[in-house]
Each structure stands twice: as C-alpha cells, then as structure tokens.
Amino acid sequence: MALHDFRTRGFLWAFALGLALSAPAAAETRSYVIEWFSLASSSQDGDCPGGVNLPTREQYFKSFELLGKTPEEAKALMEEFAQGGVKGANVRNMLRMRGRVNGEPTNAFVYPWTVADPQLHAVAGKYGLGFNLDGKQGPNGFQDPVTKEAGVDNQLFRALGCIEQFRGTYDYRPTFWAFIWGSMKETTPAWLFSVDGANLDRDGPVTITFDRAIEHQVFGATGDATADVTYRIDPDPRSHHVFKGEIRNGELSISAPGDLVLLLDTLSFTELRLRQTHLRLKPRANGNLEGVIGGYQPWGDIYFSFAQGGLAYEGMILNDTPGIYYLLKKHADAEPDPNTGQNTAISAAYRIEAVPVFAVPADAAIYKAGGGR
C-alpha cells in the first residue's frame, strides 16, 4: 500500500473524530404519566370567616328556607328526605327543581342563576399554592407556602376552599379529588408529558410536550401508577401542546406560558383548558416529579363538571351546586365578557404528581409487529 493511502486514511479518521468530538451532545428525552391531579389547596385553620360551609344535609335545610319554607316545614321535609321511598323521592325532586322563574320550578343544576344565592363562604387566608399569573401584587393575591412567592393567583382555591371536600394541603389530598380522580383514571386515557433537552440532569433549556395516551393509566394494588410502562401517544392534535421550558436548580418549569388543552372524561370533566399555563415540578428521590400546574381556566367548564352529576354529585361529594356557581362567578378574575363585563375565566392551580414511563408514537414498529412491553 502506498504511503499516501495511509496518510489519506489517517486524515479522514482524524477528521471524523474531530466532527464527533465537536458535535453537540445528543438530545435526551424523559416521559411521564400524570398519576395524580387535584385542586392545589392550602387550607389553614381559621381561613374561612364564618367557618367551613355547612354539610350537604344542613345546606339542604337552608335551601328550603330560601324557598320560603318555615324552619318547621324545612325540618319535616328533611325527615322525609331521610326516610327514602316515595316521600324521599318527592323531596329530592323539590331539591332538584329548586330554581324559580316567574314562580315556576326550574332545574337548579341547569339554571343555577334561578336559585337564590346561598352565600357560601370563601377563603380569606394568606396562603395559596400557585403562580403570580398577572405579575401584580393585588389584594386577592396569596403567598405560596412552598416557594414564598407573593401575589399568587389561585381564585379557584379561594372559591372552593371553604367546602370541606375541597380542603387540603400540598401533602394532604382533598376528599373530592381523591374520589373523582381515582374514578377517572380507570375510565379515561392517561395524560402524558415528555421533557427533551441536551442533559436533563443539568440546568438548561428544555422542551416540554403534553399529550394524551391511547391507554388508560396502569396502576398497582396501592393505586399508584406503575413506572416504566409503555404508553402510545394519541395522535389527536387537540391534546398535543409544546412549550419552551427550562430546568433551573433542578426544578422544571415552563419559560414561555401558553395555552394547554387536555381531553379528559367526555361525561364529566370534559377537558382541561388553561391559558398562560405555568408549571413547576421538582424531582423526588424515586424519580417521580411533583409540583403545580396552573393558569386561567374557563369557570363554566368547572361548573359543568360539578353540575352534570346533578343531585347525586351534590348529595355525595359536593355541598351546594348552585352555590358553587355563585362562588365561581364572584371570584372569577380574568377574560371579561365584552358585553357584560363578567369575568369568564378564573385563576387556578392544580397539584400534580408524575411517574417515569415510556411514550412512543401510536404507530411505533413495536406495536405494528404485535410486540409490546
């Protein structure tokens, strides 16, 4: 072999090695399934002036008084309510139709504005989880008990936080969400998100992508999501959203807030819609992520999710559904209607926990071949 052949091969090898050494590190992707989702509550003793709202049965007594019944009449009706049978069914129908238009009964859940406002209590405490969405330090701003950020906008917690079933803390899950999320994760495709970056163990810019899975959440006997399961990404673009993000001091966040839509349960919580979406997640020792997601949410969506269950939801896990309508309307703080001035969106924050999984395209070869993992 001629000398120049060795020199040529040596040059090409050195050139290729130089390219390899100078090329940027390959991107890294980690995917997660959202195993827990609930209102970000931060309840404190004494944060409800006038006390926590009455339990449902006592609230029903008040509902009859608002209809003009005397205390004696209201007591008799509640006794019939407790008896069940035909009399109990008649009382339940009275509660269902406790709205009034021109003196005629109307469905209180479909037309909540036809029911007299029961004046439910709202949170007046100092602390609330979430984000300062508007960059202001207004009188309705909370202080986040975890980050200490001031001016936090979470009017959804203010509106619902004096209803016993919605009370909780960062570590203590509210009763309502333990019930509803525990039910929906069995019947609704899972929510996924992926994080892409040069090195996800270091601070730096990342891309955060939200999707919905084709499969439902896989969980074990304890109810916790199973790690390292493979989910197929639903190609439906309605739940596909990409955000610029960053990792700073080990914390994952969205650096360019935008709109997020995630389809959920078509019969209950139809979808999660957030404007100016913010995110804050920290890793746990087991590899899971936990934190808060928030933004401005149409409060009509929230009311529908409660009202569609009618008297059954109200009696079992809520308090006073028309009363919740009035709370949401009063405390809504964004996107005013141009004709009426009524705010149509409410600032909200949700507590989430996520478990590491694998997320692959729906048409991935492993599934086309009939395989799986």
Where are the regions that the model predicts?
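Bacterial N-terminal signal peptides
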Residues: G10-S22
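Extracytosolic secretory-pathway proteins
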Residues: E28-R373
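N-terminal secretory signal peptides that target proteins for export/translocation
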Residues: M1-T8
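Sec/Tat signal peptide C-region and signal peptidase I cleavage site
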Residues: A23-A27
